[in-house]
């Protein structure tokens, strides 16, 4: 049986996993997404996470408001660069959107739903 080492000496701190030599109870083993609490029963530990309506609504809003304009901006960029004389203002706007705003959209796409009650 392999579990994560809890001691903080130098040898075991830098190792990813160490064999369990002490008697650690079953509830103290580290499980992904589960708090280390002895009062949890098994049926609550393995309960699947079902997103609530607020999480689904936020995902739909982010998809329609943020990603669809991104695809439109990329298609406008493709149209402008195939044209021989593109408008410099439109090229600047699409560059600003694709290079500066889009990374923040992707950042909040992954982090904001985690802060919702059901996320």
UniProtKB/Swiss-Prot annotation:
GO terms for cellular component: membrane. Disruption phenotype: Displays increased levels of spontaneous RAD52 foci in proliferating diploid cells. It comes from the Eukaryota. It is found in: Membrane. The chain crosses the membrane at residues 53-73, 92-112. Keywords: Membrane, Transmembrane, Transmembrane helix. It is a multi-pass membrane protein. GO terms for biological process: mitotic recombination. Partially overlaps ERV2 and YPR039W. Disruption phenotypes caused by deletion of this gene may also be a result of a defect in its overlapping gene. This is Uncharacterized protein IRC16.
